[in-house]
């Protein structure tokens, strides 16, 4: 039981520190708080000056492949969020999830201006989504959550969390 009580020991300790949060929220007031990342491109999910400690990473993730004409073309309709849910009518599916998505996308974490990242892994492997097949689970360091109707689908959209404390001295960068 001493290990469990150790988890909560610091809750009542006053610390001389500051808290912060990075988010992708849409400042225009719309619900387009997402990033589209073209193949071969890299975006920065966050860059923080230190010293500090990343204590939680949370994100949702989805990758749709358009398999027929679609209203979700961001070139033709910039106001249509590609994360909208459009359920198939009469069994016709206009787009589908990329079954290999969680293996194709890499997460890269670099500390203190290192030349090589300390973390470089497929997104699914980092968040415990083996073989691009997400399933609901919760553990102390990781959590994956998906809607019941998405269960059993390779590349299905889900939300993921990581609670590993990741301390750094000068800077942390997540791509």
Question: Each PLM stretch: what is its role?
Answer:
Residues 1-175:
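Beta-strand-centric surfaces of beta-sandwich/beta-rich domains
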């Amino acid at each position: 039981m001493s290990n469990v009580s150790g988890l909560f020991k610091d809750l009542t300790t006053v610390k001389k520190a500051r808290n912060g949060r990075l988010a992708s929220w849409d400042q225009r007031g719309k619900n387009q708080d997402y990033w589209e990342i073209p193949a071969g491109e890299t975006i920065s999910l966050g860059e923080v000056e230190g010293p500090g400690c990343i204590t939680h990473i949370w994100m949702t993730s989805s990758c749709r492949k358009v398999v027929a004409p679609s209203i979700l073309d961001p070139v033709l309709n910039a106001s249509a969020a590609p994360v909208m849910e459009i359920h198939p009518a009469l069994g016709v599916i206009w787009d589908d999830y990329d079954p290999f998505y969680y293996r194709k996308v890499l997460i890269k974490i670099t500390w203190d201006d290192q030349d090589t990242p300390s973390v470089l892994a497929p997104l699914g492997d980092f968040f415990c989504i083996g073989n691009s097949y997400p399933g609901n689970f919760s553990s102390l360091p990781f959590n994956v959550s998906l809607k019941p109707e998405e269960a059993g689908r390779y590349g299905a959209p889900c939300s993921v969390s990581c609670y590993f404390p990741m301390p750094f001295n000068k800077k942390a960068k997540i791509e």
